[in-house]
Amino acid sequence: MERLDKAALNALQPPEFRNENSLAATLKTLLFFTALMITVPIGLYFTTKAYIFEGALGMSNRDSYFYAAIVAVVAVHVVLALFVYVAWNEGSRQWREGKQD
């Protein structure tokens, strides 16, 4: 009889109260990739412009702007691809855990 009561109580609980940890983990993941989206392209832009294209390769100021911008755009796409990969795996993991309940 007690098992039936516990099963009924678990069925009546709203789903948002069962997955508070997954919401916090999702928010942490989102904030982490937001920080990456801001810092990585900007950092790579100025680093590659100053040290690689102008410093090591001896390019002009105008050419180094162009190539550093390409590096920054590629970095944005890499961060986005990593975010999609992590979000996809996190969602499928939560789906599997929910399916086992």
From Swiss-Prot:
The chain crosses the membrane at residues 26-46, 66-86. InterPro entries: Vma21. This is Vacuolar ATPase assembly integral membrane protein Vma21. PANTHER family: VACUOLAR ATPASE ASSEMBLY INTEGRAL MEMBRANE PROTEIN VMA21. Associates with the V0 complex of the vacuolar ATPase (V-ATPase). Interacts with ATP6AP2. Its main location: endoplasmic reticulum. Keywords: Cytoplasmic vesicle, Endoplasmic reticulum, Membrane, Transmembrane, Transmembrane helix. It is a multi-pass membrane protein. Required for the assembly of the V0 complex of the vacuolar ATPase (V-ATPase) in the endoplasmic reticulum. It comes from Mus musculus (Mouse). Belongs to the VMA21 family. One of its GO terms (cellular component) is endoplasmic reticulum-Golgi intermediate compartment membrane. GO terms for biological process: vacuolar proton-transporting V-type ATPase complex assembly. Residues 1-25, 87-101 are cytoplasmic. Residues 47-65 are lumenal. It is found in: Endoplasmic reticulum membrane; Endoplasmic reticulum-Golgi intermediate compartment membrane; Cytoplasmic vesicle, COPII-coated vesicle membrane.
